[in-house]
Amino acid sequence: MYAIIRTGGKQYKVQAGDVVQVDKLEQALGAEFEINEVLMVGGESTAVGQPLVKGAKVTVVVTKQAKTRKEIVFKKKRRQGYRKFATHKQEFTELFVKAISFDGKTAKSDEAATVVDVKAVRAEKAQARVAARKERAANKGPAEVVKKAAKKVAKKKVAKKAVKKTVKKATKTGAKKKAAKKTSKKA
């Protein structure tokens, strides 16, 4: 049995045992609640709502409250010097579909919902990193103080004397061309 539910203005096709990401819902982590906005129920017999199916409900459990990956928002208008750069993370709720019930029939999930607390997992990882850093520092032992040798100062090299460069004299043909150019220009 499957159902098409509506939440957050969007429609989702779900079956018992599915995990669905929907827009953020104000529900506690691990909370079990019913969604009554069922647009259609399918399976052995199909029921289409106008707009909702009466007596149909989907029981779900909140398994995760988190944010999506970072999305880059980049706007540009060419040749105008207009560039905007921003990022965005959308909050979402992950739901585990426990059961679908309609017209006295109920389709239940064989599996149990696994609730994940993202903040607790992140805190555990941070503590593990700190503990590993402290352990490495303890294994390394006390730092030894080593005196640096004084730097040797190199003597400056004496600069070479400048050599006069000889300038070639202009040939007669070059002088004629310059003169010709000057006379050809008119003011």
Curated annotation (Swiss-Prot):
Q: Does the keyword Transcription apply?
A: no
Keyword set for this entry? Ribonucleoprotein, Ribosomal protein, RNA-binding, rRNA-binding
SUPFAM superfamilies listed in its UniProt record: L21p-like
A GO cellular component annotated for this chain's UniProt record is: cytoplasm
Give the Gene Ontology MF terms in alphabetical order: rRNA binding; structural constituent of ribosome
Q: Which InterPro entries match?
A: bL21-like, bL21-like_sf, Ribosomal_bL21
Q: Does the keyword Ribonucleoprotein apply?
A: yes
What residue spans carry the region label Disordered?
Answer: 157-187
Biological processes per GO annotation: translation
Q: What role does it play?
A: This protein binds to 23S rRNA in the presence of protein L20.
Annotated PANTHER family: 50S RIBOSOMAL PROTEIN L21, LARGE RIBOSOMAL SUBUNIT PROTEIN BL21M
> How does this chain assemble?
Part of the 50S ribosomal subunit. Contacts protein L20.
User: Which family does the record claim for this protein?
Assistant: Belongs to the bacterial ribosomal protein bL21 family.
- Kindly provide the name given to this protein in its UniProt entry: Large ribosomal subunit protein bL21
Name its species: Bdellovibrio bacteriovorus (strain ATCC 15356 / DSM 50701 / NCIMB 9529 / HD100)
